[in-house]
Amino acid sequence: MTTLIPEVVSGIHFHYMGKTGTVGLWYKGLQVPRLSFVDGSRQFFRVGSYFIKAEYVFEGYSGQCANEIYIQNRIRPQDKKYFTKLLACSDIVSEGIQWTMFPWYNLRPTSCDSKIFAVCYKQVISLCERYQIYDVEYAFNTNWYIHNGRPLIVDCGIGGQSE
């Protein structure tokens, strides 16, 4: 299936939670229905007249740290060819942070502190840049870190929930 790229991208939100790796996609505050599911590793979503391919790997644990990815505001014209890779940063985040560096499933929510976050953030930046994904902004609980601008926010939530 061809992945079409919308001219304007705003508020796309991936939310991962639970042992089953449940995935949801939100666009402008509305949940977008998944179109198909292939081999447990690929989803296609419709946003307006566009089809968006989202690939992900996730082994989250309910009640512990959950991963969220937001794509905010805009994508620079020169980065549009990386749009599907930007969406696939969910792969990158879970590959990099999850959970080879830290045994998140052994952490209590109160243990998700800034020291752990700092290493987490460095790894996310490294992985996203490896895949030529730019403008990364990482949010961890109440701490916000900005890297080269702002369309991508990666947020470690607590308890598998997000606001």
Model feature map: region roles:
Residues M1-P33:
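Juxta-kinase regulatory segment immediately upstream of eukaryotic protein kinase catalytic domains
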Residues G24-L25, R42-V47, L86-D91, W144:
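Short, exposed beta-strand/loop patches in secreted or surface proteins that constitute
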Residues K28-R74:
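ATP-binding glycine-rich loop module of kinase domains
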Residues D39-G40, I97, A139-T142:
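Short, surface-exposed coil-to-beta transition loops
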Residues F45-S49, W104, H147:
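Active-site beta-strand termini and strand-to-loop segments that position acidic
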Residues A54-Y56, R76-Y121:
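Conserved structural core of kinase catalytic domains
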Residues S126-Y134:
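Protein kinase catalytic-loop region centered on the HRD/HxD motif
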Residues Y134-E163:
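Catalytic activation segment of kinase domains across protein kinase-like and atypical kinase folds
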